[in-house]
Amino acid sequence: MLVNEGIRAREVRLVGANGDQIGVKSKHEALEMAQRVNLDLVCVAPNAKPPVCRIMDYGKYRYEQQKKEKEARKNQKVITIKEVRLSPTIEANDFNTKLRNARKFLEKGDKVKASIRFRGRAITHSQIGRDVLERLAKECEDIATIEARPKMEGRSMFLVMAPKTEK
């Protein structure tokens, strides 16, 4: 952001402190007008012909901009993907533990990637793994939507669920 002497243009379109159009003035005149009211001359549109400059308190303006950026960062939600690993021959209690973890992640607002790794000859029975993932998805369907249906990648099968958004 160009301020006061940092402005290189000879002529500028000047906007007053309260937002009124003053007109096209020389840079020197605009600087004098800003200094008379103890404010800064700030170039708000440097690419315009002639550049648009405004008389304002630059310190206050920068503070407001930083406050807006901080507020915007605070309101951003970072979505992370949590992984729950299962096996095709998972027992009931182990499945319930994994289900509880998946539901906890979804309720927190994170996406869940459920994966099954097939070891050895278990890959020949990939339907068993698909059934386990489908069962997990069915148990979570009240709080989650399925983003990616179960699919094989190498020796693993994946399912991605995202939390349902409230409207």
Swiss-Prot record:
Question: Cross-referenced InterPro entries, in alphabetical order?
Answer: T_IF-3_C_sf, T_IF-3_N_sf, Translation_initiation_fac3_CS, Translation_initiation_fac_3, Translation_initiation_fac_3_C, Translation_initiation_fac_3_N
* Biological function: IF-3 binds to the 30S ribosomal subunit and shifts the equilibrium between 70S ribosomes and their 50S and 30S subunits in favor of the free subunits, thus enhancing the availability of 30S subunits on which protein synthesis initiation begins.
Q: Which GO terms describe its cellular component?
A: cytosol; membrane
Molecular function terms from GO: ribosome binding; translation initiation factor activity
Assembly behavior = Monomer.
- Respond yes or no to whether keyword Hydrolase is given for this record: no
Taxon lineage: Bacteria, Bacillati, Bacillota, Bacilli, Bacillales
Q: Which SUPFAM superfamilies match?
A: Translation initiation factor IF3, C-terminal domain, Translation initiation factor IF3, N-terminal domain
Please give the organism: Shouchella clausii (strain KSM-K16)
- The protein's name in its UniProt record: Translation initiation factor IF-3
Principal place of residence: cytoplasm
Question: Where do the TM regions start and end?
Answer: none
